[in-house]
Amino acid sequence: MSSVEQITGKKILVTGVTGWVAGPLAESLAAQGNTVYGAARFKDPDQRQPWHDKGVQTVSIDLAKGNLDEVPADLDLVLHFAVAKSNNFEEAFASNAHGSADLMEVAAARSDKLSFFHCSSTAVYEPKHGEARKETDLLGDSHRPMPGMPTYSISKIAGEVLVKHTAKRLGVPTVIARLNVPYGDAYGWMSFHLMMMERNIPVPVHVDQPTTYTPIHADDINRSIPYLLSYANTGAEIVNWGGDQLVSIEDWCEEMGRLTG
């Protein structure tokens, strides 16, 4: 990875801040001397204080309903991680596609210096086992068979289309990063699979093993943001986003079994 200066002294909105990926990132950016706003629905007011304690201000937004009144003015950067997982396509499109474009529109109307980072997913690719994906590869509906995610791939594709269109129309420098498998010290597929193993629940794998991914740790997610932003342009550059090692579900389950007995 090229050397890129860390982000500091900026006014930043991080959406989906209550999620696994965006939360640690918002906390890290606040610690680097940025003014950080963490956005989520925050239906429970008590959810806000822990973020304030970490130096992250909170704003309430609802992408599906178009509730964006609290989006701050004069932002330098939006890091858009909010995502909805729904069995209903209309609900998924409202949040992941229309909501993403609306967010850019509102933020850009309130700032003349905005850059936009849109977190997409490698779930947008056509199902093709065992082959590395390039950003130009065919798109598809790979996550439809997964429990609770029948609309995920298609709505994330729709989100990319609308974000790309809106960036070009408004002239907002944008990068679309297709995230592979994120994990941290206390979250991610590995933790989930360990809990399944402890309960003797079979871990699903591809019929043609090994089931490989390129996992990326929270620390590397945080460190890679400035580099990815260097690709932002009004054409909304698309980049794959993962770790630099191929690792399979079979491998990490075997290793966790060895470590835990």
Q: Residues of each region from the PLM?
A:
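Active-site segment of SDR-like NAD(P)-dependent oxidoreductases
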Residues: 84-85, 122-129, 180-183
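Active-site helix of classical SDR
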Residues: 155
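Mid/C-terminal beta-alpha module of Rossmann-like enzyme folds, strongest
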Residues: 199, 224-261
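NAD(P)-dependent short-chain dehydrogenase/reductase
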Residues: 130-131, 161-213, 218, 222, ...
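NAD(P)H-binding glycine-rich loop region in Rossmannoid oxidoreductase-like domains
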Residues: 45, 60-98
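Conserved Rossmann-fold NAD(P)-dependent oxidoreductase catalytic core, especially the SDR/UDP-sugar
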Residues: 101-151
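N-terminal Rossmann NAD(P)H-binding glycine-rich loop of SDR-like oxidoreductase domains
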Residues: 4, 12-32
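N-terminal Rossmann-fold cofactor-binding loop
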Residues: 39-44
